[in-house]
């Protein structure tokens, strides 16, 4: 897993170089039309762009129609991870307890509530991407 700064003018080139032509899956989580367009651009032929960020109800994004068809790309929406909490949360707990859900590998940081402001600063700098906040 890699993290790239979408605001970097060389982001698209960096992703394509790192992934040898684009990613198989791109996830847009910010609810930004600009981020959605970039997420689409970084996918390779046959790739899937998933958007889960909620934007303004009238927000639009633009992608070339021919790319969807000729490059066989998919754009998919996901609300709350397409999860059904009553069904899925017990399943996730079971997987975690059985060692099948490597939560610790997915974390960039574990912190206490008192450190929340510093954590937001790190998040804004792209350093703390997946954080768990422990409440007292």
State each model region's role:
Residues 1-38:
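Adenosine-nucleotide cofactor-binding segment
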Residues 3, 26, 43, 49, ...:
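Hydrophobic packing within well-folded, soluble alpha/beta domains
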Residues 3-6, 11, 52, 70, ...:
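Broad hydrophobic/π-residue packing in well-ordered secondary structure
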Residues 4, 24-28, 52-54, 78-81, ...:
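Glycine- and other small-residue-rich loops at beta-strand/loop junctions that grip anionic moieties
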Residues 5, 10, 62-64, 102:
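Poly-acidic low-complexity segments
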Residues 9, 17, 21, 37-41, ...:
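C-terminal hydrophobic helical "lid"/dimerization subdomain
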Residues 33-100, 135-136:
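Glycine-rich phosphate-binding loop and adjacent beta-alpha segment
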């Amino acid at each position: 897993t890699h993290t790239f700064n979408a605001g970097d003018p060389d982001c698209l080139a960096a992703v394509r170089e790192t992934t040898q032509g684009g990613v198989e899956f791109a996830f847009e989580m910010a609810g930004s039309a600009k981020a959605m367009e970039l997420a689409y651009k970084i996918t390779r032929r046959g790739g899937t762009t998933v958007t889960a960020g909620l934007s303004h109800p009238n927000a639009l994004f633009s992608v070339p129609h021919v790319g969807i068809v000729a490059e066989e790309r998919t754009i998919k929406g996901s609300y709350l991870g397409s999860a059904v909490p009553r069904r899925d949360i017990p399943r996730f707990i079971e997987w975690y307890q059985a060692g099948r859900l490597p939560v610790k590998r997915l974390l960039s940081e574990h912190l206490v509530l008192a450190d929340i402001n510093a954590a937001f600063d790190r998040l804004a700098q792209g350093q703390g991407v997946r954080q768990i906040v422990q409440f007292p």
